[in-house]
Design a protein with these regions (language model features):
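Hydrophobic scaffolds flanking metal-cofactor catalytic centers in soluble metalloenzymes
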Residues: 1-163
């Protein structure tokens, strides 16, 4: 697997390590709060991850990822329970026709892939709508951290997305 960090300069790598340290500090600080909750932790984690992404781009890292590019949305993604709760909360705000379409895609997704434990079919995420994430604001951490420097490397049907 091609790791995007291999293509970073030493200065960019140093910045990334610094940002990872900030994520860890944020996480630990959050756990010490009396009002701690898993859902608020996920929201803060997402915000921190987004800040890291912006910081990387500010530092000159050129990500190939763009709206409408959904190559990484054809991979198995595990989510944490609080992420699922945030997704459900978002889905409840959608118009009935969009929610019905997502429900149908979720059903088909489960039925089509029940016999594919090795995940060789690489089905589209049921939350994709015209190659765009319909839950982008609450997408799971696994999706937030998927980045590529080369869209061509993502276009194959490999079981892993190059990062």
């Amino acid at each position: 697997m091609n790791d995007f960090r291999d293509s970073l300069s030493s200065e960019e790598r140093s910045h990334l390590v610094s940002m990872q340290g900030k994520v860890k500090q944020t996480f630990l600080r959050h756990l010490q709060r009396p009002e701690w909750s898993a859902i608020s932790l996920v929201a803060e984690w997402n915000s921190t991850m987004d800040s890291i992404n912006v910081g990387m781009q500010t530092e000159g890292v050129k990500l190939a990822c763009r709206a409408g590019c959904s190559h990484c949305c054809h991979a198995s993604v595990e989510i944490f329970s609080p992420e699922a709760f945030a997704i459900v909360r978002t889905l409840k705000t959608l118009p009935a026709d969009r929610l019905s379409a997502i429900r149908q895609r979720l059903l088909e997704y489960g039925l089509d892939n029940i016999d594919d434990p090795a995940w060789t079919k690489r089905p589209a995420c049921p939350f994709l709508d015209d190659h765009r994430c319909s839950i982008y604001a609450v997408r799971p951490v696994a999706c937030r951290q998927a980045h590529s420097l080369d869209v061509k490397a993502c276009e194959n049907d490999a079981p892993h997305i190059p990062q």
